[in-house]
Amino acid sequence: MEAVVEPAIKTKKLSKVFGNRRAVDNVSIEVPQGAFLSIFGPNGAGKTTLLRVLSTLSRATSGSATLMGVDLKEDPDKARDHIGLISHNSMLYPDLTAEQNLMIYARLYGVVDPEARVLELLEAVELKHRRLDVVRTFSRGMTQRLSIARALIHDPDVVFLDEPYSGLDPHAVEIFDDLID
């Protein structure tokens, strides 16, 4: 008998309402594991709101959603173990070093051998030479590269990207694409 493989993301009639405004309206999708999905639309169309609901930063008003088989309403903490999020908000601590920032997240997620993983990712995003510098001294592009490393620190099953190329130069876009593949 074949094992059933849960979709990476599955939603059914997912909605998010703010007052009288439906930011997300009855979205039903199924994304298989290993797939890429892009959502395009004009400003205010609900793309970021959908991402926030799927990444457990906001709760849906109605409908259902699972991530790697985990119901987002029933067990958002367990769902977060599967999620990496790259957003235009860096989620970094500006007064800490690059290395300290990644170590916080590595320990938070229970990464085995966090020191090695931090150095591996700092090298991958070409920031190893700046590992002891505080984040506030970084350019926008460097901060975004460190945010990429932060999102990948625990090798998540699903990575949500909200304007991932924002602030990246062409070389950094190549680095990013290689890491996501």
Model-based region annotation:
Residues 40-42:
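The feature captures the beta-strand-to-loop junction immediately N-terminal to the Walker
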Residues 159-162:
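Catalytic Walker B motif of ABC-type/P-loop ATPase nucleotide-binding domains
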Residues 63-71, 79:
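Conserved ABC transporter NBD signature motif
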